[in-house]
Amino acid sequence: KTNLPKLRSHVGMVFQHFELFPHLTITENLTIAQEKVLGRSKDEARDKGLKLLDRVGLKAHAHKHPAQMSGGQQQRVAIARALAMDPICMLFDEPTSALDPEMINEVLDVMVELAQEGMTMMCVTHEMGFAKTVAHRVIFMDHGLIVEDATKDDFFGKPRSDRAQQFLAKILHH
């Protein structure tokens, strides 16, 4: 039988709204769960947090509060915060939908790096170029139902359903 609480503790989640604590600095946002949930010391949590901020290109912003950062920067902090918990996989729910178009690539670049490093990820997205680059499998849904479940090559190259064909014709040709 699967121990769900234990499994959940190994799953990182990043949502379309970053949900950073506005009254805490970026460093504090990255360390609080490490200390409270994982029992890491302040120094250990801070070191891990700063290393992850460096990884997402934001180490120079460690002292700032979320309101002092762009949406793309805040979303990269949210990714670093999830990674600080040492997840075995990551769930992303429309991580770029709340961002200005110019900020989207900042976040997608970090996610592409994670995929290239072998992180298992499940991502709800409308970013088809991103999905085409990093996905192994695509599940296409419409009105809450699975319309197509295919490899990325099959989905993008020869979608089986009329609905997926219509969607891709509109999305990939603009």
Regions found by a protein language model. Give the residues of each.
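ABC family nucleotide-binding domain
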Residues: 1-152
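C-terminal boundary and immediately downstream tail of ABC-type ATPase nucleotide-binding domains
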Residues: 153-174
